């Protein structure tokens, strides 16, 4: 008997390595876990594919979906809207697939109100200096944008205590191992195993 998938909320300030950790994690047994593809009104970055990285839509389309109550969470970040489809999340979890939401603390708060079993993971950088170095190293943003992201990072990180797990991404491989351990542990909880191993447990306890 297969068990329902777990919903993981993964948050971090921009530049902490959250997206890299999630994408690397998904390369291992991608059939049992996937990242939720959010809707957004921002323009695609180089290399991003519509429907794979995000569903890129207009502001008008996004507001129409809000009116339809189609999102489990949505937020405005740096002047752009981001949202996560309710229906897609539920259908995926019912298939026994773990789902990862790459969202900020505001979105996490909304999701937790609707799905109390969601598991929060916050990724922290080892220092502000390292975070700024990573943002600068991308070569994508102006100094003004980087300064704005650094200010936003402090605000984002102040909400770390709202999450069940904290990972410091000082060493990428260690951070990846920590994230993998969290996911594995949730598959081994009593509630999950009671469902997944029901037939075996019934047989073991039979007279």
Curated annotation (Swiss-Prot):
Keywords annotated in UniProt: ATP-binding, Cytoplasm, Kinase, Nucleotide-binding, Transferase
Pfam families noted in UniProt: Guanylate_kin
InterPro entries: GK/Ca_channel_bsu, Guanylate_kin-like_dom, Guanylate_kinase, Guanylate_kinase_CS, P-loop_NTPase
Positions that bind ATP: 12-19
Organism superkingdom: Bacteria
E.C. numbers: 2.7.4.8
Every Guanylate kinase-like domain range: 5-184
One GO CC term on file: cytosol
PROSITE patterns named among the record's database cross-references: GUANYLATE_KINASE_1 (PS00856), GUANYLATE_KINASE_2 (PS50052)
GO molecular function, one term: guanylate kinase activity
Compartments reported by the entry: Cytoplasm
Enzyme class: transferase
Region forming the signal peptide: none
Disordered: region residues: 30-49
Similarity field: Belongs to the guanylate kinase family.
PANTHER family: GUANYLATE KINASE, GUANYLATE KINASE-RELATED
Free-text function comment from the UniProt entry: Essential for recycling GMP and indirectly, cGMP.
UniProt protein name: Guanylate kinase
Organism expressing this protein natively: Shewanella frigidimarina (strain NCIMB 400)
Gene assigned in the entry: gmk
């Amino acid at each position: 008997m297969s068990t329902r998938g777990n919903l993981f909320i993964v948050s971090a300030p921009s530049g902490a390595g959250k997206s890299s950790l999630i994408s690397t994690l998904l390369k291992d047994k991608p059939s049992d876990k996937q990242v939720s593809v959010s809707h957004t009104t921002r323009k695609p970055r180089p290399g991003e594919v519509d429907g794979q990285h995000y569903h890129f839509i207009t502001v008008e389309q996004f507001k129409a979906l809000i009116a339809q109550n189609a999102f489990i969470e949505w937020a405005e970040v740096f002047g752009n809207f981001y949202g996560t489809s309710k229906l897609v999340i539920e259908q995926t979890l019912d298939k026994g697939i773990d789902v990862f939401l790459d969202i900020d603390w505001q979105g996490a708060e909304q999701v937790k109100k609707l799905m109390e079993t969601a598991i929060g993971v916050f990724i922290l950088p080892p220092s502000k200096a390292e975070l700024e170095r990573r943002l600068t190293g991308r070569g994508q943003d102006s100094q003004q944008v980087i300064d704005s992201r650094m200010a936003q990072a402090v605000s984002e990180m102040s909400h770390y205590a709202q999450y069940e797990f904290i990972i410091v991404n000082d060493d990428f491989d260690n951070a990846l191992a920590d994230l993998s351990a969290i996911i594995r542990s949730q598959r081994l909880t009593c509630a999950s195993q009671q469902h997944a191993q029901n037939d075996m447990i019934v047989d073991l306890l039979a007279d």
